[in-house]
């Protein structure tokens, strides 16, 4: 039996077990442990808490580089939700260990609706895109800050993609907890996503079972961030691939337009030619640099990197 495996601190490695029950042994000539021996990797720890509803929500955290319990550090919160769990991987599109290396604490949560915790837990996403999941995340962040006094509670950022991008936008309509936010390929209007893109209808066939824009305004309007845009106060970065076949670009564009009309801090970055998942190396690096620069601007009060990538200009 052979498989690839990795952890939050160990890169991908091929493992082989000679028979069921046998201890797996690393295979191959590449020693990733040696490759990373001069790289500072943040300590990864489990985190869980009980919500006001009595549910146990799990996740994990990464300590920032240079961690000192007597100092203050900004925090970045990552989540997905919406029927997919967050993984504990070193190799990841959103390089959480790199963020830790830049001096951020990192908190990763698996809120209600995530698979892997039983059918009842997963089914909480059905016809309930917004509030319950958002409540889990907000409660989790507050509890994590209460338990970890090294966090600067005025410098907390959040980010997510796809449904996680929707959740970023929705969170900002519910709380002022965050000082900066990133929505990648996020959904702003559940009604317009319902019939758009390759997966809009098929995804909602399960996620909004027997609910449609004409018979469930509580879901399609009251849980869509676009219809609550005036509540958003947090600086928001919207990123979207121009060739996204899952979530059409208008989902970011209409939120950008709304927030611009409202005079809010919002930036929209298009990734030319990129699909829902950005696979081309140079474009992935563009996305990552944009993420790092955005958080540096708002959570570390240093706009140098951002201004180097995106020159200030008057329109």
Language-model features: where?
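Residue position within the beta-strands of beta-propeller blades
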Residues: 2-4
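Short loop/turn positions at the edges of beta-strands in beta-sheet-rich folds
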Residues: 8, 51-53, 175
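Structural motif
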Residues: 9-16
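Short glycine-rich, flexible loops that bind phosphorylated cofactors or substrates
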Residues: 10, 85-86, 190, 246
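Glycine-centered loop/turn positions within well-structured domains
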Residues: 12, 55-57, 245, 276
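Cap/lid segment of the alpha/beta-hydrolase catalytic domain
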Residues: 21-23, 30-162, 167, 193-203
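Conserved beta-strand termini and adjacent loop/short-helix elements that scaffold enzyme active sites
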Residues: 27-30, 271
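Active-site-proximal cap/loop segments of hydrolase catalytic domains
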Residues: 108-315
């Amino acid at each position: 039996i052979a498989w690839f495996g990795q952890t939050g601190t160990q890169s991908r490695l091929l493992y082989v077990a000679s028979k069921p029950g046998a201890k797996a042994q690393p295979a191959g000539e590449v020693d990733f442990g040696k490759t990373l021996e001069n790289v500072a990797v943040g300590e990864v720890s489990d985190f869980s808490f009980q919500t006001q509803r009595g549910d146990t929500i799990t996740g994990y955290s990464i300590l920032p580089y240079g961690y000192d319990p007597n100092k203050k550090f900004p925090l970045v919160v990552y989540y997905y939700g919406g029927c997919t769990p967050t993984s504990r991987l070193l190799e990841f599109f959103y390089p959480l260990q790199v963020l830790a290396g830049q001096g951020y604490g990192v908190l990763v949560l698996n809120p209600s609706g995530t698979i892997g915790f039983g059918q009842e837990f997963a089914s909480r996403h059905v016809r309930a895109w917004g509030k319950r999941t958002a409540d889990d995340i907000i409660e989790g962040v507050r509890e994590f800050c209460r338990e970890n006094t090294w966090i600067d509670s005025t410098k907390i950022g959040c980010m997510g993609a796809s449904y996680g991008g929707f959740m970023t936008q929705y969170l900002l309509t519910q709380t002022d907890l965050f000082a900066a936010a990133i929505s990648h390929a996020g959904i702003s209007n559940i009604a317009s996503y319902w019939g758009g893109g390759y997966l809009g209808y098929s995804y909602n066939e399960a996620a909004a079972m027997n609910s449609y824009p004409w018979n469930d305004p509580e879901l399609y309007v009251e849980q869509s961030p676009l219809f609550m845009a005036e509540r958003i106060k947090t600086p928001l970065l919207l990123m979207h691939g121009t060739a996204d076949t899952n979530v059409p670009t208008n989902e970011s564009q209409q939120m950008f337009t709304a927030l611009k009309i409202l005079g809010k801090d919002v930036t929209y970055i298009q990734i030319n030619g990129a699909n829902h998942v950005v696979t081309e190396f140079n474009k992935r690096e563009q996305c990552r640099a944009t993420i790092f620069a955005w958080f540096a601007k708002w959570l570390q009060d240093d706009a140098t990197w951002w201004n180097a990538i995106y020159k200030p200009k008057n329109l």
